[in-house]
Amino acid sequence: MVEVSLTVGKLDASLALLLTKDHHLIEFPTILLPNGVRAGSIIKIRCDQDFDSEKEEAEKFTKIQDEILQTFATNLPQPPNLKIKNVTQTSCVLEWDKLNLGTATLKNLILFKDGKKLGSIPQPLNNRTSKLSGLPIDKSFKVQLRLDTTAGTFLSNEIEVTTHKMTDLSGITVCLGDLTPNDQFNKEDIEEALKNMGAKYPVQQQVKVDTTHFLCTRENKQNPEYVKANDMNIPIIRPEWLKACERERRIVGVRDFYVKDCVLPDIFAKNYWQKTTSQTAGNFSAQSLPKESPAVPDKEGLPKTDLNKESVKDEPTEVDHAKEDSVTQEPAIEEISAVVSENIITPDIANEETDIVEGESTKIESVPTDEIDTKVESTPVAVETEDVVAESPADQDAAVTLEPTSVDDQELHQSDETLKQVNDGQQEIDVGDATEQPEKEEIDDIREQVNSTVNNTERQETATDDAFDTVPLEGDENIATAAKETEPTSTEPTESVNVTNVNNSASEEAGKDDNDDEDDEDEDADNEGKSNKTSEQSSEGSATGSPSKKKNKKKKKNNKKK
């Protein structure tokens, strides 16, 4: 303990100045001075150390410090535990445990994707899930949470998420709504379909964050789950969508299965829930396949037989066409051969026909050998006579006369071709019968007679042409009567042409160069038929007669040499 004697130097209301013996000045509060002290008074001050009170204070302090340490230093916030709740083709649902903040307070909870901030979780103390939508199909990415508190920041574990493929149906989570009692399915059928698909079952009764589809058959806005699904933008569809996915073995679009917009007849037509019929059909097909297996080759063989039949049917048609072509050519040859045989066997009949010709136009002796060509050429020559007769009234109808001439020319060419075939056959016969010299001599004599008759007929034709030309110019009755007399002679060119054809055919039998001569004579005959209107054309017709004589003479000489 220390005792000090001090002298009060000055006394104030708050402070007093005390002086020591060593003349040190000490300020001392006046409130601690005893009562009645004034300036010049001497006082004594004693100072002691209180060890007991010091211990008590120390114990109190340590106790308070321990409490602070245990309250704020030992209970720290825990980092969040992040988990995957559900994954689909385009979405992911994340889940984490309840946050343990300790004695700290929460500032923020942030979600990161591949190191990039996606956003803050709303109401982090209440929400423990988060859904990410609009993700790419079959892609991988990393997700992490960061917890910000007054005690510091804490990072969660990093999770790698891979979205599903279109064929992976394990992410489908269904919530079941209202079903009508008349439906073809029930809750057990839906759960069985989910099981076959590989989706999550049993079905949910309440809409949650991981609910992907809400199944019902009718709209019921009184149902809170229906309203919640509508608010959460969850597709509200019919249960047939599950069967469609089960059939396709892949996720199917929900557009055709919306409860609001679906077309029920189209859905019912597909018979998604007919299990008995499908099973019975499968069993029936499995039983019938081994029985019908031997019949398969027979069915496959049928088309082959049909093809063969068709090919067989096609072949006779080609053969028939060939036969028809050959048959059309053969009758002409058969008729000509019949005519030849008739001429050889019955010369009397031929003589009668030649007599008829002599009675109508000019007197021509009958020749049995040359009548072969006269009969064959009778039809085209008759056509030429029609041309001659038709050209007489050409002043009235010129257009009418032109049409049949084109048809007649075609018939003449066809008859000429048949005559050439017959003449070729006859030439071969004549070559084979070279020993028959007397017959050739008789033929030469007949040719001379025919040439003389041809000259007479040509003169008559020129006369008739002149008569027709002079009728419209002169009005005399004598000329009209002459024209009338010429009318019956209009038939004479028909027969005279026949004679020329006889002569030509006979000449064709004799030599090999007859084909060229026939062409020239046919052209001359056509020119003569068309020259009825003008005298100049008639003169050309007479000019064509003179070269025919020269040709006939040459042919005679050749025949005599042979």
From Swiss-Prot:
InterPro entries per record: BRCT_dom (IPR001357), BRCT_dom_sf (IPR036420), Chs5_N (IPR031673), CHS_Export/Cell_Fusion_Reg (IPR052827), Fn3_2 (IPR031669), FN3_dom (IPR003961), Ig-like_fold (IPR013783)
Compartment(s) of residence: Golgi apparatus
Bias type Polar residues, positions: 534-547
Biased composition annotated in UniProt, kind: Acidic residues: 514-526
Bias type Basic and acidic residues, positions: 297-326, 410-419
One Pfam family named in its UniProt record: CHS5_N
Domain BRCT: 164-259
Feature: compositional bias, Low complexity: 488-508
UniProt similarity note: Belongs to the CHS5 family.
Keyword terms, alphabetized: Golgi apparatus
Official protein name in the record: Chitin biosynthesis protein CHS5
Function: Involved in chitin synthesis and also required for mating.
Principal cellular location given in the protein's record: Golgi
Highest taxon in the source lineage: Eukaryota
Molecular function as annotated in GO: protein dimerization activity; small GTPase binding
Bias (Basic residues) ranges: 548-562
Gene Ontology CC annotations of this record: exomer complex; trans-Golgi network
Disordered as annotated region, ranges: 283-329, 370-562
Ranges for domain Fibronectin type-III: 78-170
Keyword flag Transport: no
